[in-house]
Regions:
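ATP-dependent small-molecule kinase phosphotransfer cores
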Residues: 31-126, 130-132
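Conserved lysine of the Walker
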Residues: 15
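Pre-Walker A (Motif I) flank of P-loop NTPase domains
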Residues: 1-4
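P-loop (Walker A) phosphate-binding loop of NTP-binding proteins
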Residues: 10
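Hydrophobic positions on the alpha1 helix immediately C-terminal to the Walker A/P-loop
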Residues: 18
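Hydrophobic anchor at the beta1->P-loop junction of P-loop NTPases
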Residues: 7
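A glycine- and Lys/Arg-enriched "phosphate-lid" helix/loop adjacent to the NTP-binding pocket
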Residues: 102-180
Length: 225
């Protein structure tokens, strides 16, 4: 099997940017990575995810329980694996993914009491990696961002238009719980944590993409060598 490396973090943490920069830098070093991302909005397999995020099943993330929501995302990943990148993985290719099963761990744990997190994670990984047959990641890069900074970045993405946010992005309490769940998962599962928040003139802000990427590449070069 090939290598599967995941970029994980809250909304607005720069996962897509860092995954893309990592692919560019890895190309320059002689690797041939395939970049994938989830949800796969260009595929019909993401239909239930779109319905969930647009509020068709309820206007709050908690209106769909952790197990049901997880299956929406898992089926999307299964379809992507079977149609797009499974062969690359089986032929020892290098896959760089913006989100993965790890996102279910973060965003669905946040719907449950902390005492139930371990049981949920056990179910989730058994379901996706064993029952569905998806490959487990070889490494996870967790981009840690202060929730307030994350919210500002999301607002900038939509130019202040709140109507463009999905039900998760609109729910600040849910995002705070997701941050707590992400930190727990990072510790428990051995993710490589990169702190992306810094303070400039007394205000919390995100580090530059290039600054974060230098730390990302130092880690990737170590695990790929």
């Amino acid at each position: 099997m090939g290598k599967l490396i995941i970029f994980e973090g809250l909304d607005g943490s720069g996962k897509g940017t860092q995954a893309e920069l990592a692919c560019q830098n890895l190309h320059s070093k002689g690797y041939d990575p395939l970049k994938i991302s989830f949800p796969d909005y260009d595929s019909p397999s993401s239909a239930l995810v779109k319905m969930y995020l647009s509020g068709e099943f309820g206007q709050r993330p908690d209106d769909v329980n952790a197990y049901a929501a997880s299956t929406f995302y898992a089926v999307d990943r299964f379809a992507s694996y079977k149609t797009r990148w499974g062969n690359v993985s089986r032929q020892n290719g290098l896959i760089i993914s913006d989100r993965y099963t790890t996102s279910n761990a973060v965003h669905q744990c946040s719907k449950l009491p902390p005492m139930h997190w371990d049981g949920f994670l056990e179910w989730l990984f058994e379901f996706e990696y064993k029952k569905l047959g998806l490959p487990a990641p070889d490494a996870v890069v967790y981009l840690a961002v202060d929730p307030d900074v994350s919210q500002r970045l999301i607002a900038q993405r939509y130019h202040g238009d709140e109507s463009k946010k999905d039900i998760q992005e609109r729910d600040t309490e849910y995002l705070a719980r997701s941050r707590a769940a992400a930190e727990y998962c990072a510790r428990k599962l051995g993710w490589h944590r990169i702190e992306c928040t810094t303070t400039v003139d007394g205000q919390k802000t995100i580090r530059t993409p290039e600054d974060i990427q230098s730390e990302v590449m130092a880690y990737l070069e170590r695990i790929l060598s």
